[in-house]
Amino acid sequence: MVDIKVVSQRSKKEVGSFSTSSSTTVGELKKQISSKTRLGTERIRLAVPSKTSKLPNAFEALGKDSDLVSKHVGADSTLYFKDLGPQISWSLVFICEYAGPLFVYPIFYFLSNLIYGTDSPKSFAQKVALVCYSLHYIKRIYETIFVHRFSHGTMPIFNLFKNCSYYWGCTAMVSYFVNHPLYTEAPIERVYLGLGLWIIGEVFNYICHIQLRNLRPAGSTERKIPRGLLFEFVSCPNYTVEILSWIGFSILTQTLTSWIFALMGAAQMWIWAVGKHRRYRKEFGDKYPKSRKILIPFLL
């Protein structure tokens, strides 16, 4: 048996000393700490001083709850504790942030007279945009409930307000101008081009999500190398085709705010894709295909 000293990462005060064996997992140690601190295990983060960061007082969080504590503890048998604050499930956050656009976007479409002080018949492009925007978020909610398997059960509750503000606010920004009485419809060829790109993006995005789901057995946090179709070319094709989808939406609506939303989303997805690409290379090493790009086939 080994006594593990757990110290607050911020105050450096000792939280307590906990007995562990060579078979004690991180999750089991969290339960011991939870019993003493009366905090839920989802709020507890355990870390060790970073061996790679040059920043002072930098820490590296321990791995999965299934990892052995002995794998991480150094010679001084000390771990550092941080309270992550109130948590909320990933799926609930996603449902809330995706449900908002389904209510916000139609407000500008159906209540034009109340919002703009005047009304006009909706063009074909405006009708198509309403359907596309709504179907995108209906699809996202469906995937959250029935498709995605999350490696982490919860996230800080602050993310609920941050994420909802982004999606709901951007929806209002896009819908206000697309549904404006003075809106000028794009040439019909451009509308169909944008619609075609949107459909291709949405269909392949769903296919990518099904492929990712099939990589991870239910209730598991196991990671495997994604393979097949677009995954042979880029690490995150689900982001690639979602960007394509929003480009299509921007072409069919031809509004500046649609392009701004598409670019904002693309920038964020690029950041996520770079992070995932690096994690794949770090985790799988030489097994990971060297020719596979991050987001754009053969280029980036």
Curated annotation (Swiss-Prot):
CC per GO annotation: endoplasmic reticulum membrane
Domain of life: Eukaryota
Gene3D superfamilies according to UniProt: 1.20.120.1630, Phosphatidylinositol 3-kinase Catalytic Subunit, Chain A, domain 1
One GO biological process term: fatty acid elongation
Parts of the chain that traverse the membrane: 91-111, 191-211, 243-263
Pfam families for this protein: Steroid_dh (PF02544)
Primary enzyme class: oxidoreductase
Compartments it resides in: Endoplasmic reticulum membrane
Enzyme Commission number(s): 1.3.1.93
Catalytic activity: a very-long-chain 2,3-saturated fatty acyl-CoA + NADP(+) = a very-long-chain (2E)-enoyl-CoA + NADPH + H(+)
An annotated Gene Ontology molecular function: very-long-chain enoyl-CoA reductase activity
Residues bearing carbohydrate: 163, 238
Keywords assigned: Endoplasmic reticulum, Fatty acid biosynthesis, Fatty acid metabolism, Glycoprotein, Lipid biosynthesis, Lipid metabolism, Membrane, NADP, Oxidoreductase, Steroid biosynthesis, Transmembrane, Transmembrane helix
Pathway connected to this protein: Lipid metabolism; fatty acid biosynthesis
Annotated membrane topology: Multi-pass membrane protein
Main location as per UniProt: endoplasmic reticulum
UniProt similarity note: Belongs to the steroid 5-alpha reductase family.
Function, as annotated: Catalyzes the last of the four reactions of the long-chain fatty acids elongation cycle. This endoplasmic reticulum-bound enzymatic process, allows the addition of 2 carbons to the chain of long- and very long-chain fatty acids/VLCFAs per cycle. This enzyme reduces the trans-2,3-enoyl-CoA fatty acid intermediate to an acyl-CoA that can be further elongated by entering a new cycle of elongation. Thereby, it participates in the production of VLCFAs of different chain lengths that are involved in multiple biological processes as precursors of membrane lipids and lipid mediators.
PANTHER family documented for this protein: 3-OXO-5-ALPHA-STEROID 4-DEHYDROGENASE, VERY-LONG-CHAIN ENOYL-COA REDUCTASE
UniProt protein name: Very-long-chain enoyl-CoA reductase
